[in-house]
Design a protein with these regions (language model features):
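Terminal transmembrane helical module of multi-pass membrane proteins
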Residues: 171-217
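Internal transmembrane alpha-helix with an interfacial aromatic "cap," most often the third helix
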Residues: 21-27, 50-106, 120-122, 155, ...
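A cytosolic-side transmembrane-helix exit/cap motif
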Residues: 56-61, 129, 155-160, 188-194, ...
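Alpha-helical transmembrane segments in multipass membrane proteins, preferentially the mid-helix core
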Residues: 17-26, 87-93, 118-123, 142-168, ...
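Non-cytosolic membrane-interface motifs at loop->transmembrane helix junctions
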Residues: 3-6, 64-76, 129-142, 191-201
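Alpha-helical transmembrane segments of multi-pass integral membrane proteins
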Residues: 39-53, 74-91, 103-124, 139-151, ...
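Hydrophobic transmembrane alpha-helical segments in integral membrane proteins
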Residues: 1-18
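Membrane-interface helix-boundary motifs at transmembrane edges
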Residues: 26-37, 93-105, 130-133, 156-168, ...
């Protein structure tokens, strides 16, 4: 039953974010915040598919243990694409609120992203095995969490300052995604049921994408 529920949910998630992302790309002008948002959604869905598709196959066939290499490779790829996702989200923030300058913030985003990617590339992660070291799981997620925290602060203050009702909950979607993700990193190996928190984490990302899509529809409607 768990295999069926997870598989159906993952298919729904991937189809939703990829469809919304493609529609945003096709329905927006080049160089706009919504074109960037659409690209961000496609990166999210495409990156997650490298992990979720092998996971669905594993759950519906011989089990996770038999798919250690494709699952590990998928997690590896996803760890990088999620970093790219937040870099793109940072530029959505800059475009939406017409931010000029603030090179220190940009430098921090790139520095945290670079450290995260470098840590993900280290062989000590043992991505392609069934048992990845917890210490490295924590280590590579420290810069990722700091990057997320920075994006949370930026969207919270800018949405509040500009009375941006469309994006007023963007910061909360990121808080929720990390809130559900961190326990999985820390304790999923001890208690596999904690891994189920990835479902509400995924829902938080769907909310993120829908915020951008609904804002695009609303603002396009006003222009017409």
């Amino acid at each position: 039953m768990r295999a069926i529920i997870e598989t159906v949910f993952d298919i729904f998630y991937l189809v939703t974010v990829l469809t919304v992302g493609i529609r945003m790309i096709c329905g927006s002008k080049a160089g706009t915040q919504f074109r960037l948002f659409g690209l961000m959604a496609v990166v999210l869905g495409a990156g997650d598919s490298f992990h979720l598709v092998p996971r669905a196959l594993a759950l519906c066939t011989t089990g996770l243990e038999s798919y250690a290499m494709p699952l590990g490779l998928g997690k590896w790829i996803t760890s990088v694409t999620m970093t790219v996702f937040y870099v793109l989200l940072y530029y959505v923030w800059r475009k939406r609120y017409q931010i000029e300058g603030q090179q220190n913030v940009t430098a921090a985003v790139y520095a945290l992203s670079a450290v995260r990617v470098v840590l993900c590339m280290m062989p000590q992660n043992q991505w392609l095995t069934n048992h990845t070291p917890l210490a490295w799981g924590i280590l590579r997620n420290i810069p990722f969490a700091l990057l997320g925290l920075l994006i949370i602060v930026l969207f919270y203050h800018s949405a509040k300052q500009n009375n941006d009702k469309a994006f007023r909950w963007m910061w909360l979607t990121i808080v929720l995604s990390f809130g559900f993700y961190i326990p999985v990193v820390l304790w999923a190996d001890v208690n596999p049921l904690i891994g189920m928190l990835m479902i509400p984490k995924t829902c938080a990302y769907v909310w993120t994408v829908l915020i951008g899509y609904n804002a695009m529809k609303a603002e396009t409607g006003k222009q017409n």
